[in-house]
A protein has these predicted regions:
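Membrane-water interface at transmembrane helix exits
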Residues: 14, 18, 53, 57, ...
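Membrane-proximal soluble regions of multi-pass membrane proteins
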Residues: 58-111
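Hydrophobic alpha-helical transmembrane segments and immediately flanking/interface helices
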Residues: 31, 35-40, 68-73, 107-124
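Pore-domain transmembrane helices of cation channels
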Residues: 25-62
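Hydrophobic alpha-helical transmembrane segments of multi-pass integral membrane proteins
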Residues: 1-16, 40, 44-51, 98-102, ...
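Hydrophobic alpha-helical transmembrane segments
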Residues: 40, 44-47, 84-92, 117, ...
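Pore domain of cation channels
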Residues: 91-146
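Long, contiguous internal "core" modules enriched in hydrophobic/ aromatic residues
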Residues: 18-26
Length: 146
């Protein structure tokens, strides 16, 4: 299911980039439509990658529930500051959603570090897609409004 969401969003992103680069008339004078479309694709990208992080880290949510400390791919601040969290703390979906949001917004890790190669590659992929969408959509919208 996550793969379907990711594939559909990738197709939408590629079509949007193609429409922008080919000067498609769909967004010729419609900055609001362009920004809304880009925003939906960007937000879906954040959610899709958050789902990937959540599903793949430590074997998924079910495996984390049984073996919370088993082989993490990400180091969360709560893992380093154990005085401030319960002893049995494990990451929840909101932790992976914040990872997805900050990766897409800052184009880099913030307070959550990837320590497995696959996790680093996922973060690079998410940041690259977000950068392309943000740069092209904002540049084209400014061009339309100017």
């Amino acid at each position: 299911m996550i793969a379907c969401l990711t594939a559909a969003n990738l197709v939408a992103a590629v079509r949007l980039v193609h429409d922008i680069l080919s000067n498609n008339k769909l967004f010729a004078n419609n900055a609001n439509g362009l920004l809304a479309t880009g925003g939906v694709i960007w937000a879906t990208n954040v959610i899709a990658f958050a789902l990937w992080y959540w599903d793949l880290d430590r074997g998924g949510a079910a495996a984390r529930a049984h073996y919370p400390q088993a082989n993490p791919a990400f180091v969360f601040p709560e893992m380093l500051h154990t005085d401030y969290v319960p002893a049995n703390w494990v990451p929840k979906f909101v932790d992976y959603l914040s990872l997805g949001f900050w990766t897409a917004t800052a184009f880099s890790p913030t307070d959550i570090s990837a320590i497995k190669p696959w996790a680093k590659l996922l973060m690079v992929s998410e940041a690259a897609v977000s950068l392309v969408i943000a740069a092209l959509v904002v540049a084209r919208a400014i061009n339309i409004l100017a």
